[in-house]
């Protein structure tokens, strides 16, 4: 029965201790202000934490510390704790402590904590006796309360007259009476502030000036109907991307037919009749001369007259032009090629005509304004129309040659006939001014020409080159006429005994003597039994053994394309 009563008494004391621990000033450690004290300092009657309880045991004299949850308390101890506590201990042991003058140590450093506790309990630096503790506490409370009220309360507002006296002059802050109400003034201030940010209308104006009327630029802002309504426009931008102004330049007045401002864009401009237009047949290849294999010897005198008239029209048109077109030479070439040239009697390509040369010579343009970078092309016109002395195979008369391929006379040599001093070389084997024919000198080599009966000819003659065993030219008469595929003249062979294999003609010679209508292939040479063929004689007309001298090699041409 006594044990149960004692147990009930201990439970009652523990409950009272827990209630004291729940008080506001006992919720923190008295020495370090840590929350949740777990020990009780029975020497002074304060609630402390676990770390501070160990430090208090190391003081001299040591403090008696008890755990709140693991020990039992007597009735006297509970009453002592009720009379004391952290609030009363603060008034006694920290009665003279000033927070402004005394520094609170860092409680994370154990050495500083120990020094602070020694100053507090052993030296009693801030100790106040219990009988005076309440008085000192009340005084500190009054001092702290008055200072707090003086700093927190606003001083009483006194009139200025009481400070300056009755003799102080009256102070007028605003002499003028406001003409507008404050509401109106505030609205104007807002309008002026809004006007400062209106950067599009009044960017450079005075921000305090009266609002100016809205300018036309602001009125038409983002109005695309007035986009091109400016009074004055730049003349350079007026014709921007206007290709009508392209035709105003004098340099492009001929090529492509760019019109002037009065013409519609990109329409060919006419400089006269349709036949006299410079660019009428430009790049029109239907008027180009046909292949020479199809129209051998078909040129006539009327075509040369037509060519002369066309060239004269070209010269007449070019005389009226003030500037030189850089493509005028090509246009003249087209007119020259479109009209065929020929002679009375054609001998191969060396056709001679009796057309007047004066009109052809007058082709070069007059008063060219600037140097043309295609001057070489411009000279082709004069090259094609220049006169060359040629010997006709039938008439032996010297005429002004208007041949397109520029036949030049061939000088007499030891291989040619003494009677024919100048032989028209059909393919231009001698140096020529024709840009389409390159000159090639005869090379001395063993000939394997299928049209040659003598294998020991002196020269491997090229086309149109007279030799001892090669026809001197197409349609050229000779005293020794042998049956060949080209019906040409053969010179007296140096070795008549070896000319045992005559060649058969595929087609007979044309009676009019105007060339050859078709090329015939020679038949294979039949070698009789028991005889050895001559060296170098080939029966295949396409398999020649000596490639030298078969085609023109050297060139003295002025053609820029070769």
UniProtKB/Swiss-Prot annotation:
Post-translational modification: O-glycosylated.
Listed Polar residues bias regions: 176-191
Coiled-coil residue spans: none
Record-annotated Arf-GAP domain positions: 11-135
Predominant place of localization: nucleus
Gene Ontology molecular function: DNA binding; GTPase activator activity; zinc ion binding
UniProt-listed CDD domains: ArfGap_AGFG1
Cellular compartments annotated: Nucleus; Cytoplasmic vesicle
UniProt modified residues of type Phosphothreonine: 177
Signal peptide: none
Subunit architecture: Interacts with EPS15R and EPS15. Interacts with FCHO1.
Function: Required for vesicle docking or fusion during acrosome biogenesis. May play a role in RNA trafficking or localization.
Entries under PANTHER family matching the protein: ARF-GAP DOMAIN AND FG REPEAT-CONTAINING PROTEIN 1, DRONGO, ISOFORM F
Name of the protein this chain belongs to: Arf-GAP domain and FG repeat-containing protein 1
Organism: Bos taurus
Gene: AGFG1
